């Protein structure tokens, strides 16, 4: 009877209340994707048709996993900027409906570390959700810009948006998720 009640409780427990668990083999340079829970996240997923609305890069795994990402409101003390968050902060249920991690295996370990360091150099810089032609700085572009500095031939799909206040070409997390030679971590 106790087992049945426990199973019923687990089935009825909203998944958003369960904290995400980091993959055991997460390494510096891996990408962490998040399906956010807010309206902006829903809009991003709608506009792009992708599963995820946010992305960050692992810059440290010890003593704790640290993820650098550009965000508007993850941390009220540091709004609209590039920040470093712990994995538990990045994947907290109020912010994350779903989390996934991927390793860009088209880069070797040293290049992934260089990529992470290049993104981390943007810490504290302001968040700019602007079109491609206007020097954007948001979650996807800080990783992509560092990536093309390492591998200039890399090309990701920019999506043209034609909405009031959002007109031009934008790079969504799904574009990085579609790059060849990504290894999705269990």
Residue ranges and their predicted role:
Residues 111-119, 135, 139-142:
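Stable alpha-helical elements in mature extracytoplasmic
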Residues 7-16:
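Bacterial N-terminal signal peptides
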Residues 130-186:
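Activation targets extended, charge/polar-rich intrinsically disordered C-terminal tails
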Residues 1-7:
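Bacterial N-terminal signal peptides that target proteins for export
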Residues 34-100, 125-137:
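Glycine-rich catalytic cores of cysteine/serine-nucleophile enzymes that process amide/ester linkages
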Residues 17-23:
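Boundary at the C-terminal end of the N-terminal hydrophobic targeting segment
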Residues 28-30:
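Loop/turn positions that initiate beta-strands
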Residues 60, 120, 124-127, 147-152:
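Sec-exported extracytoplasmic/periplasmic mature domains
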């Amino acid at each position: 009877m106790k087992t049945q009640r426990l199973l019923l409780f687990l089935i009825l427990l909203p998944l958003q209340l369960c904290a995400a668990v980091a993959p055991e083999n997460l390494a510096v340079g891996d990408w962490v994707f998040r399906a956010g829970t807010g309206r902006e996240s829903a809009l991003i997923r709608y506009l792009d048709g992708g599963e995820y609305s946010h992305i960050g890069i692992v810059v440290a795994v010890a003593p704790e996993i640290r993820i650098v990402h550009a965000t508007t409101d993850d941390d009220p003390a540091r709004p609209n900027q590039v920040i470093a968050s712990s994995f538990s902060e990045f994947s907290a249920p109020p912010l994350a409906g779903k989390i996934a991690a991927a390793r860009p295996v088209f880069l070797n370990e040293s290049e992934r570390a260089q990529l992470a360091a290049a993104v981390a150099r943007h810490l504290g810089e302001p968040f700019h959700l602007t079109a491609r032609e206007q020097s954007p700085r948001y979650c996807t572009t800080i990783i992509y810009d560092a990536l093309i500095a390492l591998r200039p031939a890399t090309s990701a799909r920019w999506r043209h948006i034609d909405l009031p206040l959002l007109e031009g070409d934008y790079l969504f997390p799904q574009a990085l998720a579609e790059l060849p030679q990504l290894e999705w971590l269990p």
